[in-house]
């Protein structure tokens, strides 16, 4: 993994990040439909539960193209944002990526992959990537969709912000698209 320290390359990567992530607090339609997205976990990989981490690491190692960019996505002071390039799809690179963005909201993306979108039930995380990547993460997408619908119905049984409710509905629309 290499930290991007060339200012022009960094600006190009951050411009792509900004197109992909319209906001760190909302799942906008622009973000969700952008074809450059590879993978994102809303609170960072460290918050995965049960066997999600292993599934994600295995899928990353098997499916990640040779050149991915990881960028922080925080509203921090100037200079807080940083980017790295993942050069190899190995478990060591995956662990380095986790360390680099420990506890941060971050995006991992490739500029040449058509994406699909999947929301995990546990902890409301978003996973996006090529369909083959998602099939490694959840071999039975129909089952995952049913689980998510149950989760959505339970969540909407009490009050949430409109944005959260819209994000849940957006997730269902994209899961319908996948199915």
Residue ranges, per PLM feature:
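Structured alpha/beta or helical-core interaction and ligand-binding surfaces enriched in interleaved
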Residues: 1-125, 129-179
